[in-house]
Each structure stands twice: as structure tokens, then as C-alpha cells.
Amino acid sequence: MALDRSDGLNSLGFAKAPADTRVVVAMSGGVDSSAVAAQLADEGYDVVGVTLQLYDHGAALAKKGACCAGRDIHDAARVAETMGFPHYVLDYENVFKDAVIDEFADSYLAGATPVPCIRCNERVKFKDLLETAKDLDADCMATGHYIQRKMGREKAELHSAADAARDQSYFLFSTKQEQLDFLRFPLGHLESKAETRALAAKYGLSVADKPDSQDICFVPNGNYAAVIEKLRPGAADPGEIVDIDGNVLAMHRGVIHYTIGQRRGLGIGGLDDPLYVVKLDPDTRRVIVGPKEMLSTRTVPVREINWLGDTPFDSQQEWQMDVKIRSTRPPRGAVIRPVSATEAEVELIVAEEGVSPGQACVFYAPEGGRIFGGGWIHKG
């Protein structure tokens, strides 16, 4: 599990013995962070496990595969007991609601399609938890994310995971340089999830065969609309489904049930050609549908840019890079034109469908897998 290793440095990149290196491990109770904690403890590091209690939404606590639910806290504690290191649970429910859940609900109300996992990493795990790690006199904080931290000529760099199928770089683009300096990602170099499970089995951890977490952690059974309705009464008020000319085709059961590019579940039949959601208008509660070709675009406005390059983002008129506009899509060629230090117009070389406000646009080097940051797609 070597990171930044060279002569005189331990596997976490420090010039001292593992026993003299304190590392806080962010433990979700899943197999990934558990394997990280176990291996580091086995290597002799001064490991401190920390689990965040993020929510208590009734059914969410019992949701199989949820992150940091009641059973997951128990699993993390068992791993710590097995490997002989201290483990703490911190109540971050109010922080999580203010920083992540409220924005998630409001984004859907505004017609966007948010990615709460990015905000959680940005505003909770890599902010408050990282500061807690420093308060515990840790030298670094390790997580179970599948991404690589590599040392460049001048500073630590963020790189895609060796296992492309597990790569989580899309969800970590907003990591700041000062955070990256303190973070470690011991699983990023592994070729497959099977290697992680083998590590957990090697140490006799009960989570070795635990299923991966699925969907959004605080949304029971994937029913995000029910969560939004609970948080924002009236969010599911009905409205009209109209075509691009404003003709009413059907009624819908709330804008929050729809996303850009959606085809299924529109309740529109008897048409010669399929229709897709091409726009959401929350002010009029209208869902606008049109032909598939209307989903294609080459221009993507991006703001709140976090830049991890070696020179200032706005020091050039344009950057030739690859970008990823959804977590499930591969990076594609683009020209990024800075408007300011935190805003840009991204021109896709080949048009893509379903570019949605609220999603992230992540910047990658054309070769080598380095992540240069990214920003949030918004309405132009």
C-alpha cells in the first residue's frame, strides 16, 4: 500500500517510522475504508479511526448498503476492535443537513440534478473531518476512495485510480491543494476491488464480503423525491408537460421527479417519435420535452471552479483538456476557456447529450490521468 515511497520515507511519505506517524482513517464501515485502516495498523502506524454519524432518517438507518448508517458504525467499531486501534463516532447530523441535504433538496426544486456525494466530500469529510484529524495531531488522513495521490515536481497531484471501473475522481474534483497535501488514498493503485476484499479477508474482517454502498446514502431505497417532499412540502406540486411550442401533452406529478434526458415515465403515448426531457422550468412547474437531437450541446457553462493546475487557471486564454460531464461517462476532448479564476465556458469537441445543471464538469489531462480540478455546470 505504498504511497510517495522513496529512500527514507515510510509508505505514507513521511521521514519517520510508522509508529511515530499518526493517521486518522475516515471509516464508513464499508470494506474499502476498513481495509485501509487494517493495513495501516498492520504496518505499525498510529491509527485512529473516525466515523461520522451523518443522518438519522428513520428508514435510512436500516437501509442495506447505506453509508454511515447504524449498522455501518457498528461494523467500523468491530474493525477497530479486531485490529486494536481507537475508534470514535462524531455526530455530524446537523452539519451534514446544512451543508449537503438542504442544498440537495433546493437544487432539485430549482430544476437541477445535484451530486450530493461531491458536496459531502468537499464540505464535510475533507473540511470538518480533516480539521478534526489535525486537532488529533495526525500527520495525515487516509480514506478508502479509489483515486491516486502522486507527487509531482512541485506538489502533490490528483490522479485517476488504477482501476478505471472504480475510479472516483469525478466525486473528488473539488479537493483543494492544501487538503490534498494532508490526504492519502491507499487503495488508488489497486487493480481491482477483489484486491481490497482480499486484504479485508487477510485480516479476518467481518466486512470482507459486505456489499458495496449504493445510491445516495441518506435516500432510502433510492426514493429521493420522498426525501425532498419531506424536507420541502409542496415540492411535488403537479404541472404541465409541454412540447417546445408550448402545447400541453400531459400532466406531471412534480418537477422533482424529472431530469434532463429522461425518456421513461413521462406518460406520453401515441406519438410517432420518442420525446425526452430537454428543459425543466420550476417557476412555471413545466417539464419541456422534445426530440433527442435537442439534448445535444457543445457549450457547457461552468462555475465554482476548483483548479489544481501548476499555473493559475486564468493565466491562459484556453486549455486543451478532456472533461467528464457525468460520473458514468468517459472523459472527452474539450477546450476550456476561462471567464474568470472560477468560471469558464467549456466547448466540447463532440456534442454530448443530457448535459444537466447541477452535475460536475471535471477536467483531466489528455494523457496520464491527472485531474486538474473542475466545476459545476449551470444554466447559461
Curated annotation (Swiss-Prot):
Record key words, sorted: ATP-binding, Cytoplasm, Disulfide bond, Nucleotide-binding, RNA-binding, Transferase, tRNA processing, tRNA-binding
Residues at which ATP binds: 26-33, 52, 144
UniProt-listed Enzyme Commission number(s): 2.8.1.13
Disulphide connectivity of cysteines: 120-217
CDD domains, per the entry: MnmA_TRMU-like (cd01998)
The organism's place on the tree of life at top rank: Bacteria
Catalytic activity: S-sulfanyl-L-cysteinyl-[protein] + uridine(34) in tRNA + AH2 + ATP = 2-thiouridine(34) in tRNA + L-cysteinyl-[protein] + A + AMP + diphosphate + H(+)
GO molecular function: ATP binding; tRNA binding; tRNA-uridine 2-sulfurtransferase activity
Pfam families (alphabetical): tRNA_Me_trans, tRNA_Me_trans_C, tRNA_Me_trans_M
SUPFAM superfamilies reported in the protein's UniProt record: Adenine nucleotide alpha hydrolases-like
Record-stated family: Belongs to the MnmA/TRMU family.
Function text: Catalyzes the 2-thiolation of uridine at the wobble position (U34) of tRNA, leading to the formation of s(2)U34.
Name listed for the protein in its UniProt record: tRNA-specific 2-thiouridylase MnmA
Taxonomic lineage from the root: Bacteria, Pseudomonadati, Pseudomonadota, Alphaproteobacteria, Rhodobacterales
